[in-house]
């Protein structure tokens, strides 16, 4: 959902690939956002990432976490009336948005796409797009060792 929100903020029509409500037919290209894969590994020794000072509570908090990689599906669809060039324009805009700033908390490692194809049955142009992003899934522990919060952050932001 956050990736779809980020793309919308960048001027790219985006929806979750598996929405809670029925889909509406679009008149322009749209990105269907899904998570295709997620994997994690150690982020530090015994998952310990260090400490940070909390200004609000004026205490030190320990951070524990793991490095994670997400493969997002960002498939593009466009009605027949838009043509294949609308898919290319939407992909270019998406690539620029992901390269320049990227989704909050994530660092894009790789962006790939397939060819634009026309689905006769659906009457839509389609291009498969995938973005590999890295970040950290971390938890904040209080002095007693209880975890207070879980947060996903980009690799360069810890």
Segments predicted by a language model, with ranges:
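Small/polar-rich, solvent-exposed N-terminal microdomains that initiate assembly or binding
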Residues: 1-55, 156-158
């Amino acid at each position: 959902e956050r990736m779809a929100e980020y793309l919308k903020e960048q001027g790219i029509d985006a929806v979750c690939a598996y929405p809670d409500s029925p889909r509406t037919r679009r008149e322009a290209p749209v990105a269907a956002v899904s998570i295709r894969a997620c994997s994690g590994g150690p982020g530090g020794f015994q998952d310990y990432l260090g400490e940070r000072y909390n200004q609000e509570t004026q205490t030190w908090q320990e951070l524990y976490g793991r490095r994670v990689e997400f493969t997002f599906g960002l498939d593009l669809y466009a009605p027949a009336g838009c043509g294949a060039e609308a898919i290319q324009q939407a992909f270019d805009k998406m690539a620029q948005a992901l390269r320049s700033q990227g989704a909050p908390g994530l660092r894009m490692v790789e962006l790939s796409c397939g060819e634009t194809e026309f689905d006769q049955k659906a009457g839509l142009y389609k291009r498969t797009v995938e973005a590999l992003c890295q970040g950290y899934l971390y938890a904040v522990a209080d002095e007693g060792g209880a975890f207070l919060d879980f947060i996903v952050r980009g690799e360069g932001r810890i």
